[in-house]
């Protein structure tokens, strides 16, 4: 069983702020009796009854338990989105680790909910979001008026990510709230580029002005670039081999270069680091996931990454760890901390807001904080209730990291055993903990 976590809104974000909201509503002439009750209601984040129900429902996965919701609404998606649509399994509702599809069947959510529901559907802890609305906390803010909850969330993230570290200019010290992982990664790429190009005419000449920035990414099995996935912005897509003619023009005009590194091959990393830090070239950054979930769940080893980071420090090359998919699935909330890594950028999202809001963020070291405000911002990036969802998820995980780790290890070990029982079908099981992929010889 998970450790019991219970809190009211006042417990989670502080009585002083909640009272300020209530006082403001009273000053507007509103009755605050219901709001006051909501502010002090203690919510059990994951009751024992909910945990038991989650376990019991496993036996009915795949079964139809209610009549299908038959409808002719197919949406108006683009050709590719419509081709990929399986509306029969789209959720009518969900609870815990399951959803009920439009076909009336019970589905185990798994990868279908794409990493962003580690707490499952309708997690009780998120009732505090409903209570925040009852209290009168508004969601919409602006970059120049980031609300109290968002500022508190930023501070709690920095505290959590630096826990146990010695302060330095490599310490993660600031946060940009950017809604989507694609924009969060792009912000990191922009900050890497500010060492080569001016963001605008008000900036001084960059430290590596005149040299060609070289970005390191992970290679696929044949040495190409398709294994790395860092979102859908144009620049990030050129990093993985998309827009080939555009990238060819970029490289031939020496604007930047993308170099792929063989998976877990430190000698390849070392030779390319030396090669691209001579003459006209300079390494601009090393971008990586830890579990390549868009490429067979291949895991980068701690030994490879630690050695790669040592080389990055030697050659003044910032590191960006993309934890959009892996965050919140491991003890301590960040997988890179379990590896003992100290990156300049950490991109998080999906798991932190638990599927309640799009709320990705990039955490930045002091030495790489180089953009002006309009260098990377999103109008809706600092929504207050989205930040509250972060704080709720973080509170639960802070109390349950050890148990989550034990579940992850048990799951991985048992899945590996299943693979060994079918050696003619399964070539290997890749990944770590909850993020795993089964490799078959053929499909």
Put a short name on every predicted segment:
Residues 340-371, 382-389:
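Active-site PLP attachment segment
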Residues 289-301, 317-339:
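Conserved PLP phosphate-binding loop immediately N-terminal to the Schiff-base lysine helix
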Residues 271, 291-315, 375:
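Active-site core of PLP-dependent enzymes with the aminotransferase class I/II
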Residues 408-412, 422-443:
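Conserved PLP-binding catalytic core of the aspartate aminotransferase-like
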Residues 393-416, 428:
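Structural signature of PLP-dependent enzymes
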Residues 1-172, 268:
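N-terminal glycine-rich, Lys/His-bearing helix-loop that initiates the first secondary-structure elements
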Residues 1-23, 116-130, 156-288, 302-303:
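PLP-dependent aspartate aminotransferase-fold enzymes
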Residues 141-151, 174-185, 325, 348-353, ...:
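Active-site nucleophile and cofactor-binding loops and adjacent substrate-binding regions
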């Amino acid at each position: 069983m998970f450790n019991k976590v219970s809190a009211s809104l006042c417990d989670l974000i502080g009585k002083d702020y909640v009272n300020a909201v209530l006082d403001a509503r009273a000053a507007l002439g509103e009755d605050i009796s219901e709001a006051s009750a909501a502010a002090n209601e203690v919510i059990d984040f994951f009751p024992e009854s909910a945990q038991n129900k989650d376990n019991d429902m496993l036996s009915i996965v795949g079964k139809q338990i209610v009549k299908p919701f038959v409808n002719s609404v197919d949406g108006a998606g683009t050709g590719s989105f419509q081709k990929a649509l399986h509306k029969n399994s789209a959720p009518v509702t969900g609870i815990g680790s399951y959803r009920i599809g439009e076909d009336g069947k019970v589905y185990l959510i798994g990868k279908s909910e794409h990493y962003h529901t580690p707490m499952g559907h309708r997690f009780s802890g998120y009732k505090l979001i409903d209570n925040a609305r009852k209290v009168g906390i508004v969601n919409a803010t602006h970059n120049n008026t980031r609300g109290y909850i968002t500022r508190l969330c930023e501070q709690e993230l920095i505290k959590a990510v630096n826990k146990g570290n010695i302060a330095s200019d490599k310490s993660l010290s600031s946060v940009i709230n950017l809604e989507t992982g694609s924009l969060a990664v792009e912000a990191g790429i922009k900050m890497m580029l500010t060492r080569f190009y001016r963001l605008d005419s008000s900036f001084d000449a960059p430290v590596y002005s005149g040299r060609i920035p070289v970005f390191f990414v992970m290679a696929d099995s044949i040495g190409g670039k398709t294994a790395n996935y860092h979102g859908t912005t144009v620049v990030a897509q050129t990093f993985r081999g998309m827009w080939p003619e555009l990238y060819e023009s970029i490289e031939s005009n020496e604007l930047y270069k993308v170099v792929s590194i063989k998976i877990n091959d430190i000698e390849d990393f070392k030779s390319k680091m030396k090669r691209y830090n001579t003459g006209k070239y300079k390494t601009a950054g090393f971008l990586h996931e830890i579990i390549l979930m868009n490429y067979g769940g291949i895991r980068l080893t701690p030994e490879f990454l630690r050695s790669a980071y040592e080389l990055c420090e030697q050659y003044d090359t910032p590191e960006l760890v993309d934890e959009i998919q892996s965050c919140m699935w491991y003890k301590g909330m960040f997988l890179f901390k379990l590896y003992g890594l100290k990156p300049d950028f950490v991109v998080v999202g999906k798991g932190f807001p638990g599927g309640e809001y799009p709320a990705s963020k990039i955490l930045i070291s002091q030495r790489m904080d180089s953009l002006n405000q309009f260098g990377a911002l999103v109008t809706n990036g600092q929504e207050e209730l989205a930040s509250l969802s972060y704080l709720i998820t973080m509170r639960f995980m802070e109390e349950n990291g050890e148990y989550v780790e034990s579940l992850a290890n048990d799951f991985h070990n048992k899945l590996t055993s299943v693979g060994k029982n079918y050696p003619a079908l399964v070539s290997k099981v890749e990944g770590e903990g909850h993020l795993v992929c089964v490799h078959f010889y053929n499909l």
